[in-house]
Amino acid sequence: MTLKASEGEGGGGMRTALSDLYLEHLLQKHNRPEPVSPQLSAVMEDMYTNGPAALGSPAQTQGQEARKVRLIQFEKVTEEPMGITLKLNEKQSCTVARILHGGMVHRQGSLHVGDEILEINGTNVTNHSVDQLQKAMKETKGMISLKVIPNQQNRLPALQMFMRAQFDYDPRKDNLIPCKEAGLKFLTGDVIQIINKDDSNWWQGRVEGSSQESAGLIPSPELQEWRVASGAHSAPSEAPSCSPFGKKKKYKDKYLAKHSAIFDQLDVVSYEEVVRLPAFKRKTLVLIGASGVGRSHIKSALLSQNPDKFAYPAPYTTRPARKSEEDGKEYHFISTEEMTRSISANEFLEFGSYQGNMFGTKFETVHQIHKQDKVAILDIEPQTLKIVRTAELSPFIVFIAPTDQGTQTDTLQQLQKDSEAIRSQYAHYFDLSLVNNSVEETLKTLQETFDQACRSPQWVPVSWVY
């Protein structure tokens, strides 16, 4: 049976309800006092200079403006990295390239991106190699003294953005990242709080719910999409090195991802912006899996065991009704002309043909189930996930994988291969993945997880709210 996904309808039905829920959540959160983050103490003293020989003089010399120089002192009491990367600017001056959120320097709050470093513990950074300075910084214990020229540009407020990862990432295997040790490992489905995205290629973030407080580097959406589309093996642009004093690198590849239509054609995925909502009921349960994995059995069991909770939208078909079939029960029987008109009007969520007859599921039949305060069960093809994943249908998507136990027959191996193909392409849509070793256990886990999701705060696509 060849199925096609309909263009569908707008998400206006649920959008208002979820928008109101989100607004109420924000108001409640805003009225609560924010926790105070602990900071390390740092001593700062401002001086003025128009050159190295005039440190401490507040005056200006003829034709020159005095530059504000800040003396920063703080104590390094552990082996913890300082959490900064530096680079040489166009004047070959050493400047702060990035500050890792939650790291030592971020917590004591005295350095900022763009600050120019003049001295470290009384040693002028000019005329010293990067290796020498890096070694000195690493071996320094106790009090650290820095003379810096603060960056005068306006500092942006902290971000409040969360993204759901749509791919697995391990910085240890990434040849593009400027510092593997500073990278953040995550898996598909992890929610990442974005801390900083000043660098167009490397954002800073941390996995929500993780015990790790400090942020790590992650590829920006543009970089990840460029990487996937081009099969990149080299970095697309300059990036600060991992050492505290990074050397400039030049790369051959020119990064033009933002202006390329190739990503629309390839459907490249990276991250999805999400928001956290208070508990609300998911209105649709979607079962995804390869043909023969047991979705129909699971669907039938859910319907028979919970008739007051779940319902299945009867498909429409142009096939003639059999004697034992009642119109509107197993199927809605309509003419080919009616089916064609409804398809043209985008009334079908999914439609296709089988043995010369047309079949399809209408949005309206799903809505009717929702109006009865029941959960609609859909067992659709993976390509339809984009259509159903809206605030209007508010789906909970479950991927059913074949058993990994027992004898590996040719049929089972093919089923596992088909299943893996679906998983690799659509895993970023799944709310739950289950291996169907036992129908009873699968049903139990599915229902428990679904019920728990409806009772708990949930991360949903930002498009469901705005």
UniProtKB/Swiss-Prot annotation:
**Alphabetized UniProt keyword annotations:** Acetylation, Cell membrane, Cell projection, Lipoprotein, Membrane, Palmitate, Phosphoprotein, SH3 domain
Q: Which residues carry this modification: Phosphothreonine?
A: 49
As for PTM, the annotation reads:
Palmitoylated.
GO molecular function terms attached to this record: signaling receptor binding
Residues of the PDZ domain: 71-152
Q: Which residues carry this modification: N-acetylthreonine?
A: 2
Say yes or no: keyword Phosphoprotein present.
yes
Do you know which PROSITE patterns this protein is assigned to?
A: GUANYLATE_KINASE_1, GUANYLATE_KINASE_2, PDZ, SH3
Read off the Pfam families from this record: Guanylate_kin, PDZ, SH3_1
Q: How does it assemble?
A: Heterodimer with PALS1. Interacts with DLG5 and NF2. Interacts (via guanylate kinase-like domain) with WHRN (via third PDZ domain). Interacts with PALS1.
- Say which family it is in: Belongs to the MAGUK family.
> Any idea what this protein is called?
55 kDa erythrocyte membrane protein
Q: Which species is listed as the source?
A: Bos taurus (Bovine)
Gene, per the UniProt record: MPP1
